[in-house]
């Protein structure tokens, strides 16, 4: 069992990574929001089960959570315990941060992607129309409990997809971690306990350091967490991919853009694509002309856009990055880099 703490505007969050975590130790007056099909780790607490997946990040689902909290007589001394994947954790963060202007929140991520991404950061959101995370809040949890036991039964494709986010942390923030990942792909794909704990712990430590430095995205530092996500989010919507698969494509495209702009050496583009492929993640995708146009069109709705420009985090070498102001059309063209040899289907 490994743990650390990070500080923020609401105080301190405890992060625990290990197996067999005693959940009741970390919550007071719990009410549970849980993904359908999962076993409630706090069976004596009131619970609402919702279907997981991106569809849960809706105003309709948010309304159901508010009704549940009201019927459970939750107040500002209650703790909403969110048990599930990243989409459900996003919804829970939004609900906890807005119900009665804020109640307690504990995150229990049950997928690898949720552990290394959605659980930490304090972002809660719902989708609006075709745009991901358009309506949201910043609201930090009291604790994040990453029990690796949840990952034993995770479907292989879902499990593998999370490594796009893990690679992102090493690629953009920590060259030594990036090198460790290149040496540890087999152990991680085999769900080796020690390697998995190390990957989750180090990913969270890196993300926490960024959140501490720029909790509300006011200084530009937190933009590094969006490496691969500008192109990735557009492709996720158009192709219906898992989030991690789309981020993998986004990383490949944005690295190519960085190289074309003269920031990144070609060897790192190919080296990182090889690492993503080692985790059985895509770096190319066939798109029809209509899909390509749709993906490009979605770039203009990206939250990093300011008028005619997108502020894009670009990796310049493993562990180093810059924030570059690029025209929307220039970033949109980067979508083409994931199409094999620039051809559309």
Curated annotation (Swiss-Prot):
SUPFAM superfamilies: Dehydroquinate synthase-like (SSF56796). It catalyses: 7-phospho-2-dehydro-3-deoxy-D-arabino-heptonate = 3-dehydroquinate + phosphate. It is an enzyme of class 4 (lyase). One of its GO terms (molecular function) is 3-dehydroquinate synthase activity. Belongs to the sugar phosphate cyclases superfamily. Dehydroquinate synthase family. Binds 1 divalent metal cation per subunit. Can use either Co(2+) or Zn(2+). GO terms for biological process: amino acid biosynthetic process; aromatic amino acid family biosynthetic process; chorismate biosynthetic process. The gene is aroB. Zn(2+) binds at residues 165, 229, 243. It holds the Pfam family DHQS_C. It is found in: Cytoplasm. Pathway: Metabolic intermediate biosynthesis; chorismate biosynthesis; chorismate from D-erythrose 4-phosphate and phosphoenolpyruvate: step 2/7. Disulfide bonds: none annotated. Catalyzes the conversion of 3-deoxy-D-arabino-heptulosonate 7-phosphate (DAHP) to dehydroquinate (DHQ). Its cofactor is NAD(+); Co(2+); Zn(2+). This is 3-dehydroquinate synthase. Transmembrane segments: none annotated. InterPro entries: Dehydroquinate_synthase, DHQ_synth_AroB, DHQ_synth_fam, DHQS/DOIS_N, DHQS_C. Its main location: cytoplasm. GO terms for cellular component: cytoplasm.
């Amino acid at each position: 069992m490994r743990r650390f703490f990070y500080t923020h505007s609401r105080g301190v969050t405890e992060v625990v990574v290990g197996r067999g975590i005693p959940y009741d130790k970390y919550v007071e007056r719990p009410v549970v929001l849980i993904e359908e099909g999962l076993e409630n780790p706090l069976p004596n607490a009131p619970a609402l089960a919702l279907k997981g997946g991106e569809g849960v990040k809706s105003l309709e689902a948010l309304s159901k959570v508010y009704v549940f909290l009201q019927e459970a007589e939750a107040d500002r001394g209650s703790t909403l315990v969110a048990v599930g994947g990243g989409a459900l954790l996003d919804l829970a963060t939004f609900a906890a941060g807005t119900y009665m202007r804020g109640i307690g929140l504990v995150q229990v991520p049950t997928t690898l992607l949720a552990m290394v991404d959605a659980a930490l950061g304090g972002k809660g959101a719902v989708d609006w129309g075709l745009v991901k995370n358009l309506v949201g809040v910043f609201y930090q949890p009291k604790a994040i409990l990453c029990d690796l036991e949840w990952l034993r039964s995770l479907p292989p494709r879902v499990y593998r997809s999370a490594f796009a986010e893990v690679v992102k942390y090493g690629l953009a923030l920590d060259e030594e971690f990036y090198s460790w990942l290149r040496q540890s792909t087999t152990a991680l794909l085999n769900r080796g306990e020690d390697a998995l704990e190390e990957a989750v712990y180090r990913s969270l430590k890196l993300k926490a350091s960024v959140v501490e430095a720029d909790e509300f995205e006011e200084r530009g530092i937190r933009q590094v967490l969006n490496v691969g996500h500008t192109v990735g989010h557009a492709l996720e919507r158009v192709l219906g991919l898992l989030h991690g698969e789309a981020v993998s494509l986004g990383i490949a495209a944005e690295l190519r853009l960085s190289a074309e702009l003269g920031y990144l050496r070609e060897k790192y583009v190919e080296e990182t694509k090889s690492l993503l492929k080692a985790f059985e993640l895509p770096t190319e995708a066939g798109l029809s002309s209509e899909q390509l146009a749709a993906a490009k069109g979605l770039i203009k709705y990206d939250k990093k856009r300011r008028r005619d420009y997108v502020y894009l985090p670009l990796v310049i070498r493993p562990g180093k990055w810059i924030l570059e102001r690029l025209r929307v059309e220039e970033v949109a063209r980067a979508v083409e880099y994931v199409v094999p040899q620039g051809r559309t289907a």
